[in-house]
């Protein structure tokens, strides 16, 4: 259970900050590109990665939430979790262990690996986006 006030703060402060900072970095990137300033474009990469990742990660995060809670997966997702983790309980244990091990900020993810066609647990530091850093498609994310 997540308290509504915490989610409101998270949305209005954290996600909004990533969005605003990404927009500012994109404007600077466009200006640097127009001026042919390759050094300026390269210098913006950390801001684009951090704020772009924060924006993407939180957009995915919001789609994972439900006022009534999600409950136990059903259908194809449940079948894939059982195939790749043995059971839903085993999946939760694996995901919990991975996210608890993150030092500082980061994300715990359930992702689909298009190379193996299996679900995997992955963690990313700070705001690194799952797909851009691992090639996996994010299905469910936990902001740590």
UniProtKB/Swiss-Prot annotation:
Pfam families: Sod_Fe_C (PF02777), Sod_Fe_N (PF00081). Binds 1 Mn(2+) ion per subunit. Its EC number is 1.15.1.1. It is found in: Mitochondrion matrix. InterPro entries: Fe/Mn_Superoxide_Dismutase (IPR050265), Mn/Fe_SOD (IPR001189), Mn/Fe_SOD_C (IPR019832), Mn/Fe_SOD_N (IPR019831), Mn/Fe_SOD_N_sf (IPR036324), SOD_C_sf (IPR036314). GO terms for molecular function: manganese ion binding; superoxide dismutase activity. Mn(2+) binds at residues 10, 58, 143. Keywords: Manganese, Metal-binding, Mitochondrion, Oxidoreductase. GO terms for cellular component: mitochondrial matrix. Its cofactor is Mn(2+). SUPFAM superfamilies: Fe,Mn superoxide dismutase (SOD), C-terminal domain, Fe,Mn superoxide dismutase (SOD), N-terminal domain. It catalyses: 2 superoxide + 2 H(+) = H2O2 + O2. Destroys superoxide anion radicals which are normally produced within the cells and which are toxic to biological systems. Homotetramer. Belongs to the iron/manganese superoxide dismutase family. This is Superoxide dismutase [Mn], mitochondrial.
């Amino acid at each position: 259970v997540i308290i509504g006030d915490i989610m409101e703060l998270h949305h209005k402060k954290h996600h909004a900050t990533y969005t605003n900072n990404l927009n500012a970095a994109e404007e600077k990137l466009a200006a640097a590109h127009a001026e042919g300033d390759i050094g300026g474009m390269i210098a913006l990469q950390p801001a684009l990665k951090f704020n772009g990742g924060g924006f993407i990660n939180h957009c995915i995060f919001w789609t994972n939430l439900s006022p009534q809670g999600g409950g136990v997966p059903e259908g194809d997702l449940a079948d894939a979790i059982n195939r790749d983790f043995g059971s839903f309980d085993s999946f939760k244990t694996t995901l919990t262990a991975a996210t608890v091990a993150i030092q500082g900020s980061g994300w715990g993810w359930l992702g689909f690996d298009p190379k193996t066609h299996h679900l995997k647990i992955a963690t990313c530091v700070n705001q690194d986006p799952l797909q851009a850093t691992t090639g996996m498609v994010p299905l469910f994310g936990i902001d740590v």
